[in-house]
């Protein structure tokens, strides 16, 4: 396996080291290439993501990302627009995959959370995030600002199909989330894609939630969700809420998937670079480790993915609430591999 590693900034380097420790404990065929991308490189020479970087990344089977950013030194939006979004768009990462599971040892803010285990499939390259908009008469009383949500049938259909495939292999329940009573044009396109693709998956039960209703149900009855599919903006909101109800983002892994598999998909923990605790060795690496499991499953190595998930489950369940070092967590997960 050829793996591109973007450790990034802050605690990204620390959690990535533990994720690689676990990966190398399972497989001896992994060839890694480190990429200096993120705030440090930007501050050093002003570079964000070059064509040469992209060409080199495309030569790999997958990308493992730690965390990007340093809000103390880089203005908001610079790295997002210049690095993270171009990676997503130019590598055609149409599917943003976010598993949400309440692990033993994790504390949900919900009084009676039940058994929470669902996946959010978020469209990743269209909607309001595609950069279609602008400003007229800026700084005047007549200023006009617009953001256009761009949806294509091709883009929606492939994400919907991915979600149906995942539902078929899980509990066979798919919930699509939108705001069709207000966003009638995009909503109609999404509904037709759901109905058309759904004919190929007769065993999958399909439900619909308005986005505002979904935020209520995710708090009041999250255990009823299996696979959720939604657009870019709504997915961004729901996945953060999903992280909260499952005990925080310390265990939240994610994948940015090219469904065509023409480009390497990218896997990363959801948390940020947390520069305030960087270097202290107290960051929880489990989200990065679970991102490796997500990556292996994507690449067809289900057996080792399951071993990692079971090892993290055992480690999380053994915690007593006391402090634990980043490297110690990685060592415990390796020791739990069976």
Curated annotation (Swiss-Prot):
Cofactor binding mode, per the note? Binds 1 Mg(2+) or Mn(2+) ion per subunit.
Metal-binding listed as a keyword: yes
User: Per its UniProt record, what PANTHER family does this chain match?
Assistant: D-MALATE DEHYDROGENASE [DECARBOXYLATING]
**What is the annotated quaternary arrangement, including any partners?**
Homodimer.
Q: Where does substrate bind?
A: 88, 98, 122, 212
Say yes or no: keyword Amino-acid biosynthesis present.
Answer: yes
Stored InterPro entries? ICDH/IPMDH (IPR050501), IsoCit/isopropylmalate_DH_CS (IPR019818), IsoPropMal-DH-like_dom (IPR024084), LeuB_actb (IPR023698)
Protein name in the entry: 3-isopropylmalate dehydrogenase
Subcellular localization: Cytoplasm
Give the intrachain disulfide bonds.
none
Its GO biological process annotations read: L-leucine biosynthetic process
Residues with site note (Important for catalysis): 129, 179
Tell me the residue numbers annotated for binding NAD(+).
272-284
- UniProt-listed NCBIfam families: PRK03437.1 (NF002898)
Q: Where does Mg(2+) bind?
A: 212, 236, 240
Family from the record: Belongs to the isocitrate and isopropylmalate dehydrogenases family. LeuB type 2 subfamily.
EC number in record = 1.1.1.85
**What's this chain's function?**
Catalyzes the oxidation of 3-carboxy-2-hydroxy-4-methylpentanoate (3-isopropylmalate) to 3-carboxy-4-methyl-2-oxopentanoate. The product decarboxylates to 4-methyl-2 oxopentanoate.
Q: Which GO terms describe its molecular function?
A: 3-isopropylmalate dehydrogenase activity; magnesium ion binding; NAD binding
**Substrates-to-products reaction catalysed:** (2R,3S)-3-isopropylmalate + NAD(+) = 4-methyl-2-oxopentanoate + CO2 + NADH
Q: Which UniProt keywords apply?
A: Amino-acid biosynthesis, Branched-chain amino acid biosynthesis, Cytoplasm, Leucine biosynthesis, Magnesium, Manganese, Metal-binding, NAD, Oxidoreductase
Gene from which this protein is expressed: leuB
Q: List the GO cellular component terms.
A: cytoplasm
Q: HAMAP family attached here?
A: LeuB_type2
Broad EC category = oxidoreductase
Cofactor names from the entry are: Mg(2+); Mn(2+)
Q: In which pathway does it act?
A: Amino-acid biosynthesis; L-leucine biosynthesis; L-leucine from 3-methyl-2-oxobutanoate: step 3/4
């Amino acid at each position: 396996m050829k793996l591109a590693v973007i450790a990034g900034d802050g605690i990204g380097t620390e959690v990535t080291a533990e994720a690689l420790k676990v990966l190398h404990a399972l497989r001896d065929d992994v060839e890694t290439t480190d990429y200096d991308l993120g705030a440090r490189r930007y501050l050093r020479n002003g570079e964000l993501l070059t064509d040469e970087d992209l060409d080199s990344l495309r030569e790999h089977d997958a990308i493992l990302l730690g965390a990007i950013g340093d809000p103390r030194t880089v203005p908001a939006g610079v790295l997002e627009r210049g690095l993270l979004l171009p990676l997503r768009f130019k590598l055609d990462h149409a599917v943003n995959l976010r598993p949400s599971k309440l692990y033993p040892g994790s504390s949900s803010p919900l009084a009676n959370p039940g058994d929470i285990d669902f996946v959010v499939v978020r469209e990743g390259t269209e909607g309001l995030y595609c950069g279609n908009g602008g400003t007229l008469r800026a700084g005047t009383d007549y200023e006009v600002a617009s953001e256009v949500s761009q949806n294509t049938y091709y883009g929606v259909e492939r994400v919907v199909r991915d979600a149906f495939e995942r539902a078929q292999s899980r509990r066979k329940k798919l919930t699509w989330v939108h705001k069709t009573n207000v966003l009638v044009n995009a909503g109609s396109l999404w509904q037709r894609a759901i109905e058309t693709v759904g004919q190929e998956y007769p065993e999958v039960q399909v439900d619909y939630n308005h986005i505002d209703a979904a935020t209520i149900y995710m708090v009041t009855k999250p255990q009823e969700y299996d696979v959720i599919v939604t657009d870019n903006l709504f997915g961004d909101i729901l996945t953060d809420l999903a992280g909260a109800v499952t005990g925080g983002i310390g265990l939240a892994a994610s994948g940015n998937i090219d469904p065509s598999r023409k480009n390497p998909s990218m896997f990363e923990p959801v948390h940020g670079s947390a520069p305030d605790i960087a270097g202290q060795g107290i960051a929880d690496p489990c989200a990065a480790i679970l991102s490796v499991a997500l990556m292996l499953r994507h690449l067809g190595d289900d057996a080792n993915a399951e071993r990692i998930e079971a090892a993290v489950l055992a480690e999380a369940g053994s915690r007593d609430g006391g402090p634990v070092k980043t490297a110690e967590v990685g060592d415990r997960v390796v020791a739990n591999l069976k």
